[in-house]
């Protein structure tokens, strides 16, 4: 059997602490936390103009938090959306909440999608984060000039959610689908069966572009997701 080749994308234009204009409704600030898990760092996305949502505020690095505060001066963060509770995604929600008095939205605390104990205490998990608003699959979040649908995608973590920006047919994929690497699926909280089901779920959607929290956007979304599924099934055989 030929192993499936995933068409990885390694280009990534960024500079730390700068506000990149990506599309009419999407901007991004990259945190200075490069690693083997985060690629060049956590890409914190800003949806909208004026009254905005922040997707995955990122790690608790003062430089990054200050950059977000400074770059968004004159704007108001009305929503903070968390794809999942890992230390490179959710902790910066706490200081940003203080600045703007914003509510956070997520599936639940770490291990929320799991029954057995153990998932709640794994390394790399953000155990502090509890969303102000718990969202479920299909929930709609209405902002000022933007609309987001919640897409529950357990696998990488049991509480992983993608956020679909309706106005641009775009999906913020967190760590569920990345362009430069496959996801780490580590038990007890990660689950391979859920992960493959969540990938198959994306194939049924009509999103045209993916914005992962690490690395650049993915435009050939269906083929990309199918390659991920095939790659995992090759390995499981």
Regions found by a protein language model. Give the residues of each.
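Metallo-beta-lactamase
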Residues: 52-54, 59-61, 121-130, 140, ...
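Short, structured coil segments at secondary-structure junctions
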Residues: 22, 99-100, 206
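Active-site HxH/HxHxD metal-binding segment of metal-dependent hydrolases
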Residues: 40, 59-145, 169, 219, ...
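C-terminal regulatory/interaction regions
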Residues: 3-8, 237
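Glycine-rich, phosphate-binding/catalytic loops in enzymes
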Residues: 45-46, 70-73, 97-99, 189-190, ...
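Conserved beta-strand hairpin/beta-sheet module of binuclear metal-dependent hydrolase folds
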Residues: 12, 16-74, 162-173
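Residues at the C-termini of beta-strands that transition into short coil/loop
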Residues: 30-32, 81, 108, 214
């Amino acid at each position: 059997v030929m192993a499936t080749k995933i068409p990885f994308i390694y280009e990534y234009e960024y500079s730390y602490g700068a506000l990149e204009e990506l599309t009419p409704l999407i901007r991004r600030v990259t945190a200075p936390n490069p690693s083997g898990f985060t690629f060049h760092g956590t890409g914190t996305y800003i949806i909208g103009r004026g009254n905005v949502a922040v997707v995955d505020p990122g790690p608790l690095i003062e430089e990054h938090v200050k950059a977000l505060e400074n770059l968004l001066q004159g704007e108001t963060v009305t929503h903070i959306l968390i794809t999942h509770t890992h230390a490179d995604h959710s902790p910066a929600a706490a200081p940003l909440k203080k600045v703007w008095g914003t509510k956070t939205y997520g599936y639940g605390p770490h291990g929320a999608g799991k029954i057995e104990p153990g998932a709640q205490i794994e390394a790399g998990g953000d155990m502090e984060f509890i969303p102000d608003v718990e969202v479920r699959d299909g929930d709609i979040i209405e902002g000022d000039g933007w609309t987001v649908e919640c897409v529950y995608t357990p696998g990488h973590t049991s509480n992983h959610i993608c956020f679909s920006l309706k106005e641009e047919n775009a999906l913020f994929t967190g760590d569920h689908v990345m362009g430069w690497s496959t996801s780490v699926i580590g038990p007890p909280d990660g689950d391979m069966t859920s992960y493959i089901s969540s990938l198959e779920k994306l194939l049924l959607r009509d999103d045209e572009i993916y914005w992962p929290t690490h690395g650049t956007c993915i435009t050939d979304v269906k083929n990309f997701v199918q390659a991920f599924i095939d790659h995992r099934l090759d390995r499981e055989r």
